[in-house]
């Protein structure tokens, strides 16, 4: 199936959308994902600018090429470029998104809009509240609420308008690492998301487990995963990730929230695109 790729700017954020169908009524899922701006590439010949908004496209954020693949339901996902920077070059990062979209769409068996929006400062825009630095002397400023408001009040409504999406299309949010934590947190803050794919989420984040114990998610189902070597780190805070994700699963079980915790082979940097695609597919197929 041929995949159409659109690139545009909204509120000074670059956006890249993959679609496996032009029939809006056949779209069953919308996947929204926040990604580091550099993962969106540097150029694209099929740039689409919303005439009503008159927005200019930041070409440094645009992808290099369109791809042919099958795409799954629309997801929102954020990718931590800081933690994944050793995985690939900038061009490889663009292809990473293409491959991830292809893996999801190949197996989903339904119409999907896979929508990515650019994230500038990872620690600032995806952290739910302020916290001291845990690594590399980079503190967290806690601006996730601003990012969530962009997703719920601007990005998703724009997708619905731009592509004429049906009212019953389910919105899935997900991401890797700190983006996975952001996705979990978002499900506690709003009921717009049908499901969450939290892949290797940063549940070591200071105060997270206390927050999860005192609140209740609004999504129908949650996917959790972690590499079986991720908790083996000398970083005292980040080494809590294993115990905390087990506690997170227990919290969901106690609250009657359908969820799964899947353990993957390897550390935090292994098989990232496969892990993320697998997480999104679980939210669609289970």
What spans do the regions from the language model cover?
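The feature captures the conserved acid-bearing segment of alpha/beta-hydrolase catalytic domains
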Residues: 203-283
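Gly/Ala-rich beta-loop-alpha elbow adjacent to hydrolase catalytic centers
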Residues: 174-179, 183
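The conserved beta1-alpha1 loop
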Residues: 32-34, 200, 226
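N-terminal cap/lid segment of alpha/beta-hydrolase-fold proteins
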Residues: 1-22
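A conserved short beta-strand
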Residues: 192-203
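Proline/glycine-enriched tight loop/beta-turn segments at coil->beta junctions
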Residues: 21-29
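Active-site signature of alpha/beta-hydrolase-fold catalytic machinery across serine-
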Residues: 185-189
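Serine-hydrolase catalytic machinery in alpha/beta-hydrolase-like enzymes
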Residues: 28-51, 60, 64, 72-75, ...
């Amino acid at each position: 199936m041929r995949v159409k790729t659109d690139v545009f700017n909204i509120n000074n954020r670059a956006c890249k959308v993959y679609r496996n169908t032009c029939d809006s009524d056949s779209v069953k899922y919308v996947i929204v994902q926040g990604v580091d701006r550099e993962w969106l590439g540097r150029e694209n010949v099929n740039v689409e600018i919303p005439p009503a908004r008159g927005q200019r496209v930041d070409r440094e954020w645009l992808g290099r090429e369109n791809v042919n693949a099958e795409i799954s339901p629309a997801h929102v996902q954020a990718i931590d470029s800081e933690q994944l920077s050793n995985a690939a070059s900038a061009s490889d990062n663009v292809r990473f998104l293409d491959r991830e979209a292809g893996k999801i769409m190949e197996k989903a068996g339904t119409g999907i809009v896979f929508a990515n929006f650019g994230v500038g400062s990872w620690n600032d825009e995806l952290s739910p509240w302020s916290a001291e630095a845990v690594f590399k002397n980079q503190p967290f400023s806690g601006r996730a609420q601003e990012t969530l408001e962009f997703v719920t009040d601007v990005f998703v409504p724009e997708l619905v308008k731009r592509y004429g999406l049906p009212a019953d299309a389910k919105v899935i949010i997900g991401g890797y690492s700190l983006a996975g934590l952001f996705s979990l947190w978002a499900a506690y803050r709003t009921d717009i998301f049908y499901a969450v794919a939290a892949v290797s989420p940063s549940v070591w984040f200071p105060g997270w487990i206390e927050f999860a114990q005192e609140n209740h998610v609004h999504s129908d189902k949650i996917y959790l995963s972690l590499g079986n070597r991720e908790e083996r780190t000398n970083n005292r805070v980040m080494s809590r990730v294993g115990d905390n994700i087990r506690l997170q699963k227990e919290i969901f079980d106690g609250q009657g929230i359908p969820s799964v915790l899947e353990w993957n082979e390897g550390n935090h940097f292994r098989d990232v695109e496969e892990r993320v695609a697998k997480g999104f597919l679980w939210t669609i197929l289970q």
